[in-house]
Curated annotation (Swiss-Prot):
Keywords: Acetylation, GTPase activation, Phosphoprotein, Protein transport, Repeat, SH2 domain, SH3 domain, Stress response, Transport, Ubl conjugation. Residues 3-79 form the SH3 domain. It comes from Pongo abelii (Sumatran orangutan). The modification Phosphotyrosine is found at residues 467, 580. Residues 113-301 form the Rho-GAP domain. This is Phosphatidylinositol 3-kinase regulatory subunit alpha. InterPro entries: ISH2_PIK3R1, PI3K_P85_iSH2, PI3K_p85alpha_SH3, PI3kinase_P85_cSH2, PI3kinase_P85_nSH2, Rho_GTPase_activation_prot, RhoGAP_dom, SH2.
């Protein structure tokens, strides 16, 4: 059975420093089991940022080693099903010529390819095929400043070049061979590979980028991403990297060898792409791809970044005068189960050293996330919990989250990560929030609620409209790309017909000239002209469609930008509206009045509440408070009940309660926090003085504002129907 995992590619060489580490070589492919990251408390999406994870434990597919490696030394490739390896089929191998038979150069040209696939030529720690490395080193040593390099053909024939390539890499001496022969052997090597260095699978995407993206900077970034994609096997990627470094080195001395990026791309793009496999109409676009790859310095290796720290275990935790025995729930900087968006809002425009702690998004018991402001950005640091100890990384040494935070309020986090040279200076206090509601009377607050709700609805409608346009445009772009491919095939068919007709027309025209049959000659010429005209029409239609596609692709990106710019406003408006609504609810404003300010007429809306009813069964706590019942008993009590049926029980989490409610026919559970400010499902909503007050509020207010999967109200106490 296969398991899910993630693949990474090594960007730098790393020599292991500890027994549990593994060596890395540039281009190595590594696999990490998803379960190992989940066990450490990382959520979906974080695997794409290995530098934030720190040290990963995985398997080096290139060397066969298993162990720890630094996340700062690798890049994320994508997901992968991990299963037992299957033997890779060998490429076709040519039959040897029978002894005594003679072969001409033409015979050699027709011979099947002699070189093995790139995947079979590389073995760690090679950064490219050994034969290719030897050729390039010899060429750079002899001909780096040669003005005729790669442009003058040597006197060697094809058979001699292939004989050179067939030699044993270790024994062959290239010192005495002319540089032009080496250059021709280099070209022949690229042509004799079973598959081009740049696989045909990425041709169409490269061409689409060249046609659709107008910004050169954006084009380079997208091209980099495509070149590093899993579509290019890592042996091919390493070879391409090596070739680009060679071409870049040649272009650096173009004043002497006359080989600038453009000239090199014109010479080698047919060999790297194999134009016979691509449309000749796209030749210029493919040349442009190679020119950009050579011209930009993205392929040059940067110095390796700092290793993620493995801090030594502290001998003792200094007593800093703070209360390490304080409950986490009472800590002003602990916000419980709030979203990342809310955290970003609270830390917006704050000073370096501002911080807060929330529950980890993985919901694993005991794991938390510290969000710290550093360098104008939010840094997310996982707080791990194992065997009663807490910490940022192994070994875990602190007895509580409070003790951990207090330690780093006096000590720099550079102990943990050299890039985080800052202390936890300014806690974002849940007790000293900015007063959002500035007005001092109910009527004024109600008017502001109406204003914010109107703005929120307008923004929501705008976002929905953009989303529909985004989806429609995406579908149209795909249809146009398909149509362009169909045009290309149609043009190819018509051109073949045109060539066939042209070939046979010459014979018939000569025949009819001898016979003096002018009418038949005119008919043949007329048919030929009609065919050429039809080809021109199709080419014009394709050109217009390509122009439309380019414009629509630009619109598509603009829509995406606008949607992303609206999201923060939408979140902030909803948050502000909810705070005004909560203020009014706490002041005892009746629901009918709230509905007027919210403009609600549909009673099914989450804010359109039923009329206040003094006879609600919710007033009797015995109808819903079941005391110390556990999760299984709660599910048995609620099984088969209608949506909105609920109960409240004591939670396994010390000092808290749990609410169990039926949603879409299933029983869901959520924690009710008990804090110094009151009961609630999450900050800043822990404001209800009793469980009864909380239940009465959510009798008419949906839980969806706290959890998207809980679109339900606490409508029916579990024992209410039995008591009627």
């Amino acid at each position: 059975m296969s398991a899910e995992g993630y693949q990474y590619r090594a960007l730098y060489d790393y020599k292991k420093e500890r027994e549990e580490d593994i060596d890395l070589h540039l281009g190595d492919i590594l696999t990490v089991n998803k379960g190992s990251l989940v066990a450490l408390g990382f959520s979906d999406g974080q695997e794409a940022r290995p530098e934030e994870i720190g040290w990963l434990n995985g398997y080096n597919e290139t060397t066969g080693e298993r162990g720890d490696f630094p996340g700062t030394y690798v890049e994320y490739i994508g997901r992968k099903k991990i299963s037992p390896p299957t033997p890779k089929p060998r490429p076709p191998r040519p039959l040897p010529v029978a002894p005594g038979s003679s072969k001409t150069e033409a015979d050699v040209e027709q011979q099947a390819l002699t070189l093995p696939d790139l995947a079979e030529q590389l073995a760690p720690p090679d950064i490219a095929p050994p034969l290719l490395i030897k050729l390039v080193e010899a060429i750079e040593k002899k001909g780096l400043e040669c003005s005729t390099l790669y442009r003058t053909q040597s006197s060697s024939n094809l058979a001699e070049l292939r004989q050179l390539l067939d030699c044993d890499t270790a024994s062959v001496d290239l010192e005495m061979i002319d540089v032009h022969v080496l250059a021709d052997a280099f070209k022949r090597y690229l042509l004799d590979l079973p598959n081009p260095v740049i696989p045909a699978a990425v041709y169409s995407e490269m061409i689409s980028l060249a046609q659709e993206v107008q910004s050169s900077e954006e084009y380079i970034q997208l091209l980099k991403k495509l070149i590093r994609s899993p579509s290019i096997p890592h042996q091919y990627w390493l070879t391409l990297q090596y070739l680009l470094k060679h071409f870049f080195k040649l272009s650096q001395t173009s004043s002497k060898n006359l080989l600038n990026a453009r000239v090199l791309s014109e010479i080698f793009s047919p060999m790297l792409f194999r134009f016979s496999a691509a449309s000749s109409d796209n030749t210029e676009n493919l040349i442009k791809v190679i020119e950009i790859l050579i011209s930009t310095e993205w392929n040059e290796r940067q110095p390796a970044p700092a290793l993620p720290p493995k801090p030594p275990k502290p001998t003792t935790v200094a007593n800093n005068g703070m209360n390490n025995n304080m409950s986490l729930q009472d800590a002003e900087w602990y916000w419980g189960d709030i979203s990342r968006e809310e955290v970003n809002e609270k830390l917006r425009d704050t000073a370096d050293g501002t911080f807060l702690v929330r529950d980890a998004s993985t919901k694993m018991h005991g794991d938390y996330t510290l969000t710290l402001r550093k360098g104008g950005n939010n840094k997310l640091i996982k707080i791990f919990h194992r065997d009663g100890k807490y910490g940022f990384s192994d070994p875990l040494t602190f007895n509580s989250v409070v003790e951990l935070i207090n330690h780093y309020r006096n000590e720099s986090l550079a102990q943990y990560n050299p890039k985080l040279d800052v202390k936890l200076l300014y806690p974002v206090s849940k007790y000293q929030q900015d007063q959002v509601v500035k007005e001092d009377n109910i009527e004024a607050v109600g008017k502001k609620l109406h204003e914010y709700n109107t703005q929120f609805q307008e923004k929501s409608r705008e976002y929905d409209r953009l989303y529909e346009e985004y989806t429609r445009t995406s579908q149209e772009i795909q249809m146009k790309r398909t149509a362009i491919e169909a045009f290309n095939e149609t043009i190819k068919i018509f051109e073949e017909q045109c060539q066939t007709q042209e070939r046979y027309s010459k014979e018939y025209i000569e025949k009819f000239k001898r016979e003096g049959n002018e009418k038949e000659i005119q008919r043949i010429m007329h048919n030929y002209d009609k065919l050429k005209s039809r080809i021109s029409e199709i080419i014009d239609s394709r050109r217009r469609l390509e122009e439309d596609l380019k414009k629509q692709a630009a619109e598509y990106r603009e829509i995406d930008k606008r949607m992303n710019s609206i999201k923060p406003d939408l979140i902030q408006l909803r948050k502000t509206r909810d705070q005004y609504l909560m203020w009014l609810t706490q002041k005892g404003v009746r629901q009918k009045k709230l509905n007027e300010w919210l403009g609600n007429e549909n009673t099914e809306d989450q804010y359109s509440l039923v009329e206040d009813d003094e006879d609600l069964p919710h007033h009797d706590e015995k109808t819903w408070n079941v005391g110390s019942s556990n999760r299984n008993k709660a599910e048995n009590l609620l099984r088969g009940k209608r949506d909105g049926t609920f109960l409240v029980r004591e939670s396994s989490k010390q000092g808290c309660y749990a609410c169990s409610v039926v949603v879409d026919g299933e029983v869901k559970h959520c924690v009710i926090n008990k804090t110094a400010t009151g009961y609630g499902f999450a900050e800043p909503y822990n404001l209800y003085s009793s469980l009864k007050e909380l239940v009465l509020h959510y009798q008419h207010t949906s839980l969806v504002q706290h959890n998207d999967s809980l679109n339900v109200t606490l409508a029916y106490p579990v024992y209410a129907q039995q008591r009627r």
